[in-house]
Regions:
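Amphipathic, well-ordered alpha-helical segments in soluble domains
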Residues: 75-82, 108-115, 142
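Short, solvent-exposed, charged loop/turn and helix-capping segments
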Residues: 1-2, 112-136, 148-155
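C-terminal amphipathic alpha-helix
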Residues: 3-102, 156-230
């Protein structure tokens, strides 16, 4: 599972690198265009206004903003994707996969926090940095609190199902008092824990939705604040 997360991250990184190369090529062509315009203007004594290189200025500014944004997006993407794989493991009740992806999520959350320590925000705008930090804090909390809770409940439920199967396979008159008492105790324990489990799941679902939505909105606002769309 961790290998899948790494491959997806590498694919996203490769896509972004390709996009950046395309933008770089466009910048080169815009620079050439501006240079040729100046040569032509000088040759024929044509006055070129300041706005002739406006496209080049906008492209340069856009690239600076997107380059800064991309660094934070890659940090966000890595934990967001790993989190989605973890949630699928939880949904399928795969304890081994839950543990593996939980470990990976904690690792990527810590790595992201370290990257943020040396990250240089664009124009000292900390909005997206803080939104990314909030996401990393949440995913680490998922790894350290949600996953153990899910594993604990899954193991308890598995124990209950095995005990129920054993009891169902026995005739009522062949069940010992100790077996009945132990099974009833297990039933009470499951009934108690299922409520706590559902509360935990619901809380993390709400927090996850709010955290991701906050990152997306902050991301859109960050780009809109600095990219010249006109």
């Amino acid at each position: 599972m961790q290998e899948v997360a790494e491959q997806s991250y590498d694919a996203m990184e490769a896509y972004i690198m390709t996009r950046d190369l395309v933008n770089e090529k466009i910048n080169e062509e815009v620079t050439k265009l501006n240079a040729n315009q100046k040569i032509f203007a000088n040759k024929y004594n044509i006055q070129i206004g300041e706005d002739t290189s406006e496209l080049g200025k906008k492209m340069k500014l856009s690239n600076e903003v997107f380059e800064n944004h991309t660094q934070l997006y890659l940090i966000f993407f890595k934990v967001n994707f790993t989190e989605s794989v973890l949630l699928k493991a939880i949904e399928s009740n795969d304890i081994s996969a839950i543990q593996q992806n939980s470990n990976a999520l904690e690792q990527y959350s810590n790595e992201g926090m370290e990257k943020l320590k040396t990250f240089q925000p664009y124009k000292n705008d900390m909005s997206l940095v803080l939104a990314t930090k909030k996401m990393l804090e949440f995913t680490k909390k998922e790894a350290l609190e949600l996953s153990p809770s899910v594993i604990s409940f899954s193991m308890l439920n598995q124990k209950f199902q095995e005990s129920k199967k054993t009891m169902d396979n026995k005739a009522a008159n062949s069940r010992s008092k100790e077996e009945i008492d132990n099974f009833n105790k297990l039933v009470n324990e499951v009934n108690k824990e299922v409520g706590n489990y559902n509360k935990t799941i619901n809380k993390f679902n709400i927090d996850r939705s709010n955290t991701i939505n906050n990152w997306n909105v902050t991301s859109e606002n960050f780009i809109a604040r600095y990219i010249p769309f006109e």
